[in-house]
Amino acid sequence: MTNSREEILKRDFSNAFVEKMKNAIEMSHYKYGWANKTYPELAQAYKCAKERLAEYEKTHNKEYLIDVANFVMLEFLYPAFSDAKYTPTDSDKSIGLAGGISYKELMEGVQNDR
């Protein structure tokens, strides 16, 4: 069974999440100014992302996930590391799911056991 990009994105992507990211970035601009004037010289976005993820783990407030996404995006745009690069990796180099298995892998395992 193949799925179209439209079907995949309808089920497994959130435009509402991206809109919340945009709203938060806009509000942050009015509070703090241009991001490229702050990152990475005055603050490191990846450190902010780690702090917000820790807050999410404590509070389960999904607003922190919006913050994490924005800080990760800012780190992508304005990296703290001078040697930062984008290098796509194949599945064999992926670190995978943290202590878990995907539904697809589970079902493939069941099929192989039959």
Residue ranges with predicted function:
Residues 1-114:
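Flexible "arm" and connector segments at domain edges
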